[in-house]
């Protein structure tokens, strides 16, 4: 193999035993590495693509497996500086390897893989719970970032990630957020062990995500390091009740929280109304109240409040839950100029509300508020 250039690698995703996407074929390959099965056909990209070992950790997307790629010296190649990928019409494919195996990652590092910008890989390893890979990347980065502690180096690596953009630049450790979402407590504990300090403020995203995903072990751990089980208006109790996570609800109760008392508190909060409250918070409380099994009279009172303040999602939720809107709901919505609610409760199937109720009260309110759209809507209204 005198005429063969240095090794490159191609990524593959394992679909089933012996089948990979793109198609893996050991040996000589000509425009076949990216054959993808679509509707039993095999469309082919123009060229084979692969990445150098130096840039293998800098990719935005990785595969579950990799294979060595050898390119004969007489084969012409091209290079994309944005994707860091090389292209050729022909190459020789070697053995396939599990990319997320610690031995594979160690081998790549030992043979020249650059980890300075491996934020995407660090995040992916956190997502998959590959704690050994996470530790290896942070440890090995000592050569790139000398004089820094483990936490500072890990944050340097994380800052280069491009795949979890929703979590980026929000003063949170992205890898911990990802590990919480995918329920990998070992990854969470590791970053805490190297010095990461999580904010335990009332609206902490860390604790909220743990409750959203319903991982009791992570919830317990976060409480051990200082988080409050009743934070953010008992968010954990409410979302766990809504999601049917009885194990978490029972655990919360064991810590002295009374769900019935919180139901009463939520009803009072919604009834008293506060302009500082977000509609999403009110919607969450409404779902919690409904899930606990309160009687329909209470839910109807909540529907009236939703119509008064224009809470569209809350109104829709209560109607779908079986609380039928009445002419009183319609009048309240018109009085408060909530055209979105007027349209919802008059067009919703089977409501059949009287838009002319109380001597054209709704039209008078629309005119009073100078709401031309509502005037036109009521003028041209036809029952479904």
Swiss-Prot record:
PANTHER family: ANKYRIN REPEAT PROTEIN, GH09064P. SMART domains: ANK. This is Putative ankyrin repeat protein L72. Keywords: ANK repeat, Repeat. The keyword Repeat applies. It comes from Acanthamoeba polyphaga mimivirus (APMV). It comes from the Viruses. Pfam families: Ank_2 (PF12796). ANK repeats lie at residues 88-117, 119-146, 171-200, 202-231, 233-261, 298-324, 325-357. Gene3D superfamilies: Ankyrin repeat-containing domain. The keyword Repeat applies.
